[in-house]
Swiss-Prot record:
PANTHER family: 54S RIBOSOMAL PROTEIN L39, MITOCHONDRIAL, LARGE RIBOSOMAL SUBUNIT PROTEIN BL33M
Coiled-coil residues: none
GO biological process per UniProt: translation
The entry's keywords: Ribonucleoprotein, Ribosomal protein
Domain of life according to the entry: Bacteria
HAMAP family: Ribosomal_bL33
Protein name as catalogued: Large ribosomal subunit protein bL33
SUPFAM superfamilies named among the record's database cross-references: Zn-binding ribosomal proteins
Disulfide bonds: none
Entries under Pfam families matching the protein: Ribosomal_L33 (PF00471)
Lineage: Bacteria, Pseudomonadati, Pseudomonadota, Alphaproteobacteria, Rickettsiales
Length: 56
């Protein structure tokens, strides 16, 4: 069997505080800083900044 990968699932929460989020994989060995992307938020119908949070 293959070894379990080291990638983690993280939640990218909208900075517009709409409650909308994306789930993304990340490799903790390569990325030290928190992820942040400018992506589309369908609740406000605009591109906003999405920042990394812990996935519960």
């Amino acid at each position: 069997m293959a070894k379990k990968g080291s990638t983690l699932l993280v939640k990218l929460a909208s900075s517009a505080k709409t409650g909308f989020f994306y789930v993304k994989k990340r490799n903790p060995k390569k990325l030290i800083n928190k992820l942040s992307f400018r992506k589309y938020d369908p609740v406000v119908r605009k591109h906003v900044l999405f920042s990394e949070e812990k996935l519960k």
